[in-house]
């Protein structure tokens, strides 16, 4: 797995949860080329979890022939119409999939993996907050601060 970000702390975090290699996006002239170099021809699967037109394009451009791109990050506002490199999509027979998350019927298999400790979602939690703090945290989401996900775990 190759993780790409512009924040060193997030790349460090990615290594702790399984990234084999990392790329600091601000230090590379051509991120897609770097992915192809590291992976020996391009990624089999890419995921844009950020929802940014640049990350979406780079993610698709770093795929190998017959690769699959999964768009999880929501592209909205000015980012809602990314420039998709359709020439590469067609010539490399790429697959592009949009996803809002796992289908409910797959939850039992995921929960079995958690019970077997094959998945450890607690490692992805960066911060826990009280429900009263939620509006403040939601308002700051576009700043992409911190690592991991924030979980509301206190309600009273």
Name each model feature, range by range:
Residues 32, 36, 40, 78-127, ...:
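C-terminal substrate-binding/catalytic core of Rossmann-like NAD(P)-dependent dehydrogenases/reductases
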Residues 63-65:
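Helix-to-beta-strand junctions that scaffold the AdoMet/dcAdoMet cofactor pocket
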Residues 8, 57-61, 104-156:
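C-terminal hydrophobic helical "lid"/dimerization subdomain
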């Amino acid at each position: 797995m190759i993780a790409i970000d512009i924040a060193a702390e997030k790349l460090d975090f990615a290594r702790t949860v399984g990234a084999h290699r990392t790329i600091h996006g601000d230090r590379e002239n051509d991120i897609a080329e770097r992915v192809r170099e590291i992976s020996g021809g391009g990624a089999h699967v890419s995921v844009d979890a950020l929802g940014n037109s640049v990350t979406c394009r780079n993610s698709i451009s770093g795929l190998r022939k017959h690769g699959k791109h999964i768009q999880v990050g929501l592209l909205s506002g000015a980012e809602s119409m990314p420039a998709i490199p359709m020439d590469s999509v067609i010539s490399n027979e790429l697959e592009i999939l949009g996803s809002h998350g796992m289908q409910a019927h797959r939850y039992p298999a995921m929960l079995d993996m958690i019970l077997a400790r094959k998945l450890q979602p607690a490692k992805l939690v960066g911060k826990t907050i009280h429900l009263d703090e939620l509006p403040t945290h939601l308002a700051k989401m576009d700043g992409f601060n911190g690592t991991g996900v924030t979980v509301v775990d206190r309600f009273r």
